[in-house]
Amino acid sequence: AQTPVKVTVTGAAGQIGYALLFRI
């Protein structure tokens, strides 16, 4: 983790992706 922004973006994308994966 170099920048907290990247961590936030990755975390948000992971959360959304996981939610979508469970939705389907």
Curated annotation (Swiss-Prot):
Keyword list, A-Z: NAD, Oxidoreductase, Tricarboxylic acid cycle
Gene3D superfamilies tied to this protein: NAD(P)-binding Rossmann-like Domain (3.40.50.720)
Residues that coordinate or bind NAD(+): 11-17
UniProt similarity note: Belongs to the LDH/MDH superfamily. MDH type 2 family.
UniProt-listed GO biological process terms: tricarboxylic acid cycle
Lineage of the species this protein comes from: Bacteria, Bacillati, Actinomycetota, Actinomycetes, Streptosporangiales
Catalytic activity of the protein: (S)-malate + NAD(+) = oxaloacetate + NADH + H(+)
Name this polypeptide is given: Malate dehydrogenase
A GO term for molecular function: L-malate dehydrogenase (NAD+) activity
Function in brief: Catalyzes the reversible oxidation of malate to oxaloacetate.
EC number(s) given by UniProt: 1.1.1.37
